[in-house]
């Protein structure tokens, strides 16, 4: 890896980049520092341990069902004209999304570090149900923390998490409040492990989650070379905190000819409409008041991309102009869902349909040998009630 590689990751203090424009860091109180240092040390030791990495690889294959397919969306390609479109089918993983890649890695890490029980937060409920499944597999108790607003609309994931043995705790609000509560609880008990669900929060969480999710991009490279004889010309994915998209593009950060496009929800587009600030242990782009005293944010139909900030890696890549970030409205997301369902027979989660909405806009203008890979990071069961409410009549 070259010195100026974008894949070098954060420095020892958790910063991506240098100087006053660096993103990330460890902006937390002294009470949290010992736990973060312990976690970072445990992570660095684990990724040098072949036995640990082999165990992770074993369960990725035999428990999650990896590698997930790289699927040629032939009907959609013909419908749109132009680019040849592929889906990285993360929705076919056990528990229905990319989230389990990270849950498995961090639960194995917690087990290696001798932790007795687990904490996690979730917005769409997908991280909670995935972590609950892995916790059940390895016999560790789990407390899942979610905002009461999100719980009301993703009840299927909540039911699954309970079936796996998780205890659910509701806090007023959405994902932001759930993360805050999970971190606060973690600081009170050294026997606990906080399983962070995205590339957010204080160092080393963004680094750990990006490492776990980078399996997505490594598979994309291998599968695209095998199937098409070349790597994708473009990779596109949705961005809330940003873990699935980070995983999809991490392998390609030094491939300057690969166009990378992250798509936020229009109502909560921190990279498009936010400013830099410090919140939840990290410096990043945030939707915040003018004085930075409080966070702001709207509502999105995709609970997993309804986040007032974004992971610091994405803020850094945005400022470096290494990745393009844009946004999609709820109406565009719903339209993309209808198109994918009709032409490919796939009921997707709403979150990746933000990326699909942008893909639908641009694919027709690309040549036929231009390969676009969409990270289809979740399945749609959790959103069926919302979909029926908003567009149910369109299918009659």
Language-model segments: what does each one mean?
Residues 176-179, 183-204, 228, 254-257, ...:
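Active-site/ligand-binding loops adjacent to catalytic centers
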Residues 117-119, 127-183, 270-279, 383-392:
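Active-site-proximal loop->helix
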Residues 94, 110-134, 138-147, 230-245, ...:
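A short, small-residue-rich loop immediately preceding and capping a beta-strand
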Residues 25, 69, 87, 99, ...:
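Buried hydrophobic positions in well-ordered alpha/beta secondary-structure cores of metabolic enzymes
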Residues 104-115, 129-141, 249-256, 357-366:
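Alpha-helix C-terminal capping segments
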Residues 2-24, 37-115:
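Positively charged, low-complexity intrinsically disordered leader regions
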Residues 256-263, 268, 358-396:
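Catalytic phosphate/nucleotide-handling subdomain of diverse soluble enzymes
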Residues 215-228, 361-362:
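Phosphate/ATP-binding catalytic cores across multiple sugar-kinase/actin-like superfamilies
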């Amino acid at each position: 890896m070259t010195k100026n590689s974008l894949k070098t990751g954060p420095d020892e203090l958790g910063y991506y980049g240098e100087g006053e424009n660096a993103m990330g860091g460890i902006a937390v109180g002294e009470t949290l520092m010992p736990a973060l240092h312990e976690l970072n040390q445990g992570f660095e030791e684990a990724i040098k341990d072949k036995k640990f990495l082999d165990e992770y690889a074993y369960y990725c294959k035999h428990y999650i069902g990896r590698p997930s397919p790289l699927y040629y969306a032939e009907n959609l390609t013909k419908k749109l004209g132009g680019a040849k479109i592929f889906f990285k089918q993360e929705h076919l993983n056990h528990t229905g999304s990319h989230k389990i890649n990270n849950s498995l890695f961090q639960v194995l890490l917690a087990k290696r570090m001798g932790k007795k029980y687990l904490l996690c937060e979730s917005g769409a409920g997908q991280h909670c149900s995935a972590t609950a499944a892995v916790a059940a597999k390895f016999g560790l108790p789990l407390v899942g923390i979610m905002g009461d607003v999100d719980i009301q609309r993703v009840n299927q994931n909540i039911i699954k998490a309970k079936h796996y043995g998780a205890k659910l705790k509701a806090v007023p609000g959405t994902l932001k409040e759930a993360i805050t509560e999970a971190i606060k609880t973690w600081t009170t008990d050294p026997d606990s492990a906080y399983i962070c669900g995205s590339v957010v929060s204080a160092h080393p969480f963004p680094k750990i989650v990006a490492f776990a999710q980078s399996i997505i991009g490594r598979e994309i490279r291998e599968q695209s070379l095998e199937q098409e004889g070349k790597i994708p010309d473009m990779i596109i994915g949705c961005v809330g905190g940003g873990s699935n998209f980070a995983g999809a593009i991490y392998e390609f950060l030094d491939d300057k000819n690969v166009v990378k496009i992250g798509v936020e929800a229009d109502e909560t587009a921190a990279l498009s409409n936010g400013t830099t600030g410090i919140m939840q242990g990290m410096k990043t782009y945030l939707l915040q008041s003018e004085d930075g005293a409080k966070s702001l944010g709207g509502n999105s139909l995709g609970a997993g991309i309804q986040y007032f900030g974004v992971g610091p890696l994405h803020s850094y890549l945005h400022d470096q102009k290494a990745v393009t970030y844009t946004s999609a409205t709820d109406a565009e997301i719903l339209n993309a869902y209808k198109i994918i369902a009709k032409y490919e027979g796939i009921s997707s989660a709403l979150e990746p349909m933000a990326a699909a909405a942008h893909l639908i806009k641009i694919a027709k203008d690309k040549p036929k040998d231009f390969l676009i890979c969409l990270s289809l990071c979740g399945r749609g069961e959790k959103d069926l009630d919302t979909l029926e409410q908003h567009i149910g009549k369109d299918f009659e």
